[in-house]
Amino acid sequence: MTAARIFETPWGRMGVAATARGLARVVLPGKRNARALARLATIEGRQAPRAARVHARQAERQIREFLRGRRRAFSVRLDLAALPRFQKKVLLAARRILYGRTVTYGQLAARAGKPRAARAVGQVMARNPVPLAVPCHRVVAAGGGLGGFGGEAALKRRLLALEFHNNTISPQRRRERRGKSE
């Protein structure tokens, strides 16, 4: 069984779905994702295992913190069990891309052990079921362009700007920002 949560953020309406194994789906804000949010709404509030509800709440909290610039990495467990091996390998390699940094599709392919599979990596990123938790927005085209993004290019640009901005703030200022009440 799956637990789902739909929630408002300053960036727009988002949703998550989790199983007892971990986070299985993140739905980003945007027109393209209206159907996915509608599907999540059909399961939100249903009985689900406690572990699934815990993972969904944890994912929501971490997404909110991330979008406020107060989280750099996601610790929520992922449920990628239904995905093919190559896709899992690429997603786990992408999860290790540091906050505020970018890599090219080719570099990510090499990190996943398939240096000649840049296009296949691009397809995996396009189908990433858990964006933000697996930061596919940090993967860019070799020529310096943004590359594709399932959550729309403007959102990718905004996510990268958030990270680059927060990376340029001094550690003291960052501590002060974290200490402020919401």
Model-identified regions with their sequence ranges:
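Basic nucleic-acid-binding alpha-helical/helix-turn surface characteristic of O6-alkylguanine DNA
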Residues: 1-116, 162-169, 182
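Short glycine/serine-rich loop segments
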Residues: 116-158
